[in-house]
Amino acid sequence: MSGCPFLGGTLQLLSSNPRQAEEEDGSQGGVNKAAKGGIIYGDYLQLDKVLNAQVLQSEQKGNKIHDEHLFIVTHQAYELWFKQILWELDSVRDLFIKKHVRDERNMLKVVSRIHRITMIFKLLVDQFAVLETMTALDFFDFREYLSPASGFQSLQFRLLEQKIGVADHLRVPYNRRHYRDNFHGEESETLLSSEQEPTLLQLVEQWLERTPGLEKDGFNFWGKLQANIEEGLKREKHQVEKMEDTEVKQELLEDLNKQMETFTALFDSKRHEHLLSKGERRLSYKALQGALMINFYREEPRFQVPFQLLTALMEIDTLMTKWRYNHVCMVHRMIGSKAGTGGSSGYHYLRSTVSDRYKVFVDLFNLATFLVPRSWVPKLNPNIHKFPYTAECYDSSYNSCSSEDSD
């Protein structure tokens, strides 16, 4: 018999007794609580405001352009996600500022919130693909209605850069002016106020400086590492010098000399200060030591969560660079080499911001330069081997073993 294959016993809901069939259907066993009053979905999310915030300038001017709606919604979505990133970032900074990270059990909270920021940034990087469904000609149709509005005027993105720790003196000037000059009134005051607060970079730096095991009168990681590396390089050079004179021997000696120069510079505090003044390093000398120690001992229980944090911070830098790059590519595709709607050089200005000048945790990336064979890494003493909340008691950089209340 031909007909619908679903007209079998499973459709007994359409039987002569619909009430009985409904009672037997488990999917209908809930209760409609909305009928009893209280806040409902649209009110909770204030959708009347959100969904009515798309005002097309082309329509206001009597020439409604379809793709302007996509342009507005996409940028509003960016701003909402920026707001969430700032929410997470401020909470992490607060945990550091109030010294809750001295109780290392709170570090998992820090890592998970930083990880959430990276997940949001991944979404923001991918979101450009939606905007790129619009062609350059589609954008041209309504671009004239945008001026002098510009993405550079995004207060939240400037706050995000500032709070993470983008160095003010390394920023590329915007039309030969300080970036803050593009903001006025309350927005300018908000930026000024934010600049007085410690950045995530500064807070992480202070935390790294307290890494257990850096104390010269304790484990003295740095001193032991320097001695081990110098001895290791000396042994390697001795082995190479015993080889027959060949091109391979010469190459190995040149490589060893470069390594020696690299590590001589690493253990030279004055050299580090010089690189700091040039903006080539961002962390203090002691903080760099802490970061390298965490990398070497990342498999130890004490250092596993700190290593996850350093990895997540590098991921933020990576994703922000990808975001800038995708933005540059999109702008180049949409307007070519034209000036931006806000008056900047457009593509050329944006391209100049895709560099290490805007990387906050560049020192963490450069740690790979200083990796050595595991046999050269100093062996940990039993105290540092202990789990986080017990090891804190043996760490002279902490004043006590008491935990503090956390948010």
Swiss-Prot record:
Keyword set includes Metal-binding: yes
EC number from the UniProt entry: 1.13.11.11
Cofactor comment text: Binds 1 heme group per subunit.
Gene Ontology biological process terms in this record: L-tryptophan catabolic process to acetyl-CoA; L-tryptophan catabolic process to kynurenine; protein homotetramerization
Residue positions binding heme: H327
Cofactor dependence: heme
Stored PANTHER family: TRYPTOPHAN 2,3-DIOXYGENASE
Subunit structure: Homotetramer. Dimer of dimers.
Protein name per its UniProtKB record: Tryptophan 2,3-dioxygenase B
Organism: Danio rerio (Zebrafish)
Gene (UniProt): tdo2b
